[in-house]
Design a protein with these regions (language model features):
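Structured C-terminal helix/loop/strand segments within mature extracytoplasmic catalytic/sensor domains
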Residues: 76-77, 81, 124, 128-156, ...
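Mid-domain, small-residue-enriched loop/turn segments at the edges of structured enzyme/sensor domains
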Residues: 51, 72-134
Length: 234
């Protein structure tokens, strides 16, 4: 689900670095880019299209608000899902696949299962992002800051860390209910920086759950709490 917008952001930064393009580079958004019946604060703000927006703002929409139209606009700009998939695999993270756009998945709900990752692969990718110089620092700093300001999923990984002296950057993913009434996905991945300089990455995925959405988020929050207490010896 929308966790893959983190993967997309890394591939985008690599592409822009090679093209020597600034985050202020602007794209023209047409009305047909703003699909109806999908989650899109971008469309809600500019329903008629016909405007320019820079890459930085589009990343804010995808990483902070999980905007589906902004995601597909960026896919089109950077060369499609295959480009993202190949880039992530080139980093040695191969237990994942990104083959469908947001619009693909909204046209056919079953396609969402074709975009997948193991939790370990997602956590490894977070560690690679934190520790390695994948692309120019300005892109890394921007993605890092944007993830720490994520507005979605405050009841998941973040919940047990509120009030703690930590910095957390994360990206959520939320699926609809399938024909069986199960929530297809309730996900959250993130990195946590501790005040003593240590850090860890965490990925928690709840798949095809018959629990309500609030309970699925609580499961993620409980695991986040347990990991934090283990790492900090509490």
């Amino acid at each position: 689900m929308s966790v893959f917008k983190f993967h997309q952001a890394l591939a985008l930064a690599d592409y822009m670095g090679k093209q020597q393009q600034s985050l202020n580079f602007e794209l023209t958004i047409k009305k047909e880019d703003l699909k109806p019946d999908t989650y899109s604060p971008l469309r809600d703000s500019f329903p008629q299209g016909g405007f320019n927006i820079d890459i930085a703002d589009l990343l804010n929409y995808t990483l902070q608000q999980s905007d589906n139209n902004a995601c597909d606009i960026l896919f089109q700009y950077q060369g499609g899902v295959d480009t993202v998939n190949q880039y992530i695999h080139s980093l040695g993270v191969t237990d994942c696949a990104i083959v469908c756009t947001e619009n693909d998945m909204h046209q056919d709900e079953s396609l969402c299962y074709q975009n997948w990752t193991t939790p370990l692969a997602a956590a490894r990718l977070l560690e690679i992002f934190r520790k390695e110089a994948l692309f120019p620092q300005e892109y890394k700093d921007f993605i890092y800051q944007t993830m720490t300001e994520c507005q979605t999923g405050q009841d998941r990984l973040v919940a047990p860390l509120l009030g703690k002296e930590v910095t957390i950057g994360h990206k959520t993913g939320t699926g609809d209910r399938n024909a069986k009434g199960q929530q297809v996905a309730c996900n959250d991945i993130g990195f946590v920086l501790l005040p003593d300089g240590h850090a860890y990455s965490i990925a928690v995925f709840v798949k095809d759950s018959e629990e309500n959405n609030q309970e699925n988020s609580r499961i993620i929050a409980d695991i986040s709490r347990i990991v934090y207490e283990y790492v900090t010896h509490q």
